[in-house]
Amino acid sequence: MYKAKISNQSNSDHINDGLKLKNAFITAALKCVPPGDKPEKKELENCFPYFKNEINLLKNIKVIIALGKVAFDACVDFYKKEYNLTKKIKFGHNNVYTLPNNILLVGCYHRSPRNVNTGRINERKMTLLFNKFFKLI
C-alpha cells in the first residue's frame, strides 16, 4: 500500500505508530486466527455480523479489494444477503465484478507464505493492482 501511495509508511507495528491510510479501510472478514489458519464455516458465520456492520458503516466505498478467497467469499456472501446478489462470481486475482450498488469487487491473492514463495503474488503484482484501482477513487 505504501508503494501505491495509499499509506504514509511501509509497515505498522502498533496502534499508535502514525500509520495513515488515504481513501482506504482495512478489515478482516474473520476476526480470529483459526487453528491451522483454516477457518471453519461456523467461525465465519460468527464474525459475519461484525463484517456486515463495518461494510454498512462505510458510506463512500468505490472499490473493495478482497485479499484472498476467504475475504472475497465473505464479500460475495454479504452482497447475496444484503442485495440479493444472484450472478455467479468467481474468485481470481484481478477478477473484477460490479456489485448491485455499483461498487467494484476485486479479487487479489492473499500474501500468504505459500502464495509469496510460489510467486503467485509478490510486491510488484500487489502494487500494480492497488495502483490500477485506487486511480478510480
Range-by-range predicted roles:
Residues 1-137:
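A polyanion-binding, active-site-adjacent surface
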